[in-house]
Amino acid sequence: MRVTYFFTLLVLMLIALFLLACPSPRRAKLGAASETAFCRIDAAALGVIMLVYAIAAFTGLGDTHSAQSFHKFQSGESAVIDLGEVRTLDGAMLYSGLNTGSYYIEASDDGEHWQSAGSFEQNYVALFKWNDLEALSGVSTRYIRLTAQGSVWLGELGIRCSGRLYGVSSDAPELFDEQEQVPEYQYFTNSSYFDEIYHARTALENIEGIYPYEVSHPPLGKLIIAMGIMLFGMTPFGWRFSGALFGVLMLPVMYVFIKKLFGRSSIAACGTAIFAFDFMHFVQTRIATIDTYAVFFILLMYLFMYLYITGGRLRHLALSGVFFGLGAASKWTCIYAGAGLAVIWLIYWLRHFELKAFLKNCAFCLVFFVLVPAVIYYASYYPYGAARGMSGVGMYFSSDYASIVLDNQKFMFTYHSGVTTEHPYSSRWWQWIINERPILYYLKHFDDGTRSSFGAFLNPILCWSGLICMIICAVYLVKRRDEVSLFIIIGYLAQLLPWVFITRTTFEYHYFPSSVFLVLALCRVFSLIRENVKGWRFNVYGLTALSLAAFVMFYPALSGLRVNSQLATNLLKWLPNWPF
């Protein structure tokens, strides 16, 4: 038996130890918690969690400086680089910008007679990252000529001779005006990785007024990414900033949600800490993709729906609808959440039915769950219209703008229906619920036997204990008609069940929205232990501490911290399909 399997068995035994104390509950009604007001203890606990998490999230997020000036080649345009004399190159790196194409590379000793040295393909996976220019490694030359095939942006070119960067002259000065940005090697802190090649690029295109490349998701998520770029430039820190910020902002929403549900500061603090330091939450909010914003809006729409069904105030129902609209304009997975909200709303009205009030509420919902979201969704395509030369409010009433929106919906549906390409880290829904197949986002081996890597998967403490607690909630629902458990289960299944029937290629990060409800299920069991077990602190605080300890243990595999490769494998490969 490998040492890593020992950790797996030990953790499962500890989870069982902490949860075995769960008593059989009395029926719990929604809104029955008494002490739901936010107090100074809550402010202190939440403040500490947010501060510690923010430090962890923003540390090593990405470089705050990178090449900002680009030479914008036209197809067929050349740039000649003069090294001053014939030199033997150790190698070269280039930082690619927007658009795809290629560079034909030639070398010359006299600037008149040229020989081919190879080419470099600036394809979509090479954008906004440092790429080794292998064609120039070991070449002896004075002049280098790059000829673009396609309209491509090139940010910086670093040429190394005799072990150091060598200053050169060129008729494309933008290629050598930020030499201090040239790194020793490509790394996730100085380059894009995984789907950042789509979303960060599209965010910049929205800023630049260029029709976006990535149109397989609605626009709002990329517009939020663009806000970070506008603040901090087109740098790794800039395009990841918004996601990390929203990861922090999720925490007060989760804290308030748990406090409203269960009325205990201790439960809210423990649940929020477990959510904050969940692996998926940490990794996914530090990458410039759109899943973070979907989960943020899902949290808010369910929180305000809960406030509505327990308080009956229409403003809460309206806010739930607004956040549903913002979520749907970020990613279609929020539409699944909308189905869950509809079920919760319908159950509420079946229990409080009065025809006149019901019809009025239906009309209200048509406004805030159909009309308002449709307006938000439609308006989010503004950058698409602007890139086609439209401007002002009038574009929204243009048939051309409407065609852009409609055509994109058709494309998205066709695209997502047809994503069946095999991927080494793809996984199915049944693998997500047991954490069986994480998706590896980044892996780099170094000559000294260390490596840097990270991927998306749940903290095994949350994943396994949360699944057990979800099953416990289902038992409570059947035996006691427990309303709190029903609310949690509806939210969980709304996010998970659609993936059971979807045949496209899927990944572990699609389980991110469901993790919100795993936390709530865990807190439901915590609350029962808190109310009925004399030594509840051992169980509740013990499982919370175990979750935080797992985060510390796995931190290198979540942050990209360089560690010894063999040591990481021995300690972190808890299941056969974990890529560590």
Per-segment meaning from a language model:
Residues 241-262, 300-304, 472:
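Transmembrane-helix motifs of polytopic, lipid-linked glycan transferases
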Residues 301-317, 327, 346-353:
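Membrane-interface transmembrane helices that cradle and orient dolichyl/undecaprenyl
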Residues 27-31, 56-118, 124-193:
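Aromatic, loop-rich ligand-recognition surfaces of beta-strand-rich domains
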Residues 20-25, 445-449, 453-481:
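Hydrophobic, aromatic-rich transmembrane alpha-helices
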Residues 239, 243, 280-294, 333:
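Short acidic/glycine- and proline-prone juxtamembrane loop motifs at membrane-interface regions
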Residues 1-45, 49-81, 164, 177, ...:
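Transmembrane helical bundles and short interhelical boundary loops of multi-pass, membrane-embedded
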Residues 254-277, 310-319:
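Transmembrane-helix signature of polytopic, membrane-embedded enzymes
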